[in-house]
Amino acid sequence: MPVSSGIDHAEQQRLNRALVIDSLRRQGCCSRAELARLTNLKRATITNIIGEFIDLGLVVETEFLSSEGGRRSIGLRINGRRYQVIGVMITRKYYCIVRIGLSGEVYALKCHQIPAEIGVEDLVLSMEHNIHKMIAENPETRIMAIGFAVPGPYLQKEGEVAFITNLEGWDEFPISAKLQEAFDIPVLLSNDANAAAYASYWYDAQNEKNSNLVYIVAGQGIGCGLLSNGRLVQGAMGIAGEIGHTSIDFHGPKCACGNRGCLELYCSLLVLENRIKQRLLQGEASCLTADFTTRDLAEAIRQGDPLALEEYERNCGYLVVGIVNLINQFNPSTIVIGDQLVDLAPELLLRLVREQVRERLRPAIWEGLNIEVDQSEYNPIVMGAAALAAQTILEDPFSY
């Protein structure tokens, strides 16, 4: 809807531009008349704003589009080939770099393994090198911003990761400042689960189904991103949604966060793999060997290997406890579960989670809830990191 009165003219212009470009991004391609209908802005206002975007090279005209009345209109789309952003996802074992247009289309994606012995300083240098390399490979493209998604609680004000379980050297490391020094364009950092949650919202053309959403990242660690009315809920320090560090056993083992019995100590890909390896060393029968890979584990679960299946279902049971706690705390309309635990056996995980969550909820709450798994073509964390960078530019493109 158009911007209301009570703000100065310059701010009203900025907000109207942001409204128009975001509507065009969600539609992919549409006419000036369609933009006027979608935004409730006057046709003259749309014409002026689109004219500015075309002069900037941000928007281009395309082929004629057919309308319901039979009249043809010139199509418009964001010039994603010229204006792009980069997203980076950091995990405990690898990092990925994606290059997307401002409207979300993917142009390049590369992943790099993180050697076990590498320190955080050298890891940052490695990422800088490969990002600069990706930028240099496309001199005709202008990279507008870079978004990074990091595991663990990210302290926004300090620009630091508080800690990452099973990974040393990150505590109080000034990653935001280090990365900002390396690039002369805006650099944005977010928690990985927040990035994934934002991806589920940003890439949804209508933005309606996922406006109140919990996205659970179930991979090498456990975290969640919270969306309320389309906005990330981050808390006072930016660490809201750390489901992995909620206790499911107050007599449980001590966690690196200081708590006891944290969900992440019972449920994650790393925990699953370690439990299976311990049982293999004790001589239990399985089609897996002690040096199994994640792909081997997925195949063992698919084949119904008793050991792999038992431990996977055990992981899912712990995950259910965390999910039910989230439902009772935040009352989301949609819960999306993604990352490596899901990738192992998406249909099985979804069935187990739905069955067990339903048993733990009142019928009225269950009936208003949608639980799904993320099987997107691209990893939602890296895509969310890029989306956050893109949205920053789109909210005020003339400032960059």
Which residues fall in each region the model found?
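ATP-binding/phosphotransfer module of carbohydrate and carboxylate kinases, centering on a glycine-rich
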Residues: 1-64, 68-142, 259, 263-400
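Short helix-capping/turn signature of helix-turn-helix
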Residues: 26-27, 103, 167, 203, ...
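Short glycine-aspartate micro-motif
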Residues: 77, 85-89, 143-147, 213-217, ...
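Short, acidic, Ser/Thr-enriched surface-loop or helix-capping motifs
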Residues: 101, 156, 227
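Glycine-rich phosphate-binding loop and adjoining helix at the ATP-binding site
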Residues: 106-212, 348-359
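Glycine/GP-enriched mid-protein hinge/lid loop-to-helix segment characteristic of carbohydrate kinases
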Residues: 109-111, 119-123, 171, 180-302
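Short, active-site-adjacent cap segments at secondary-structure transitions
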Residues: 153-156, 194-197, 223-224, 233, ...
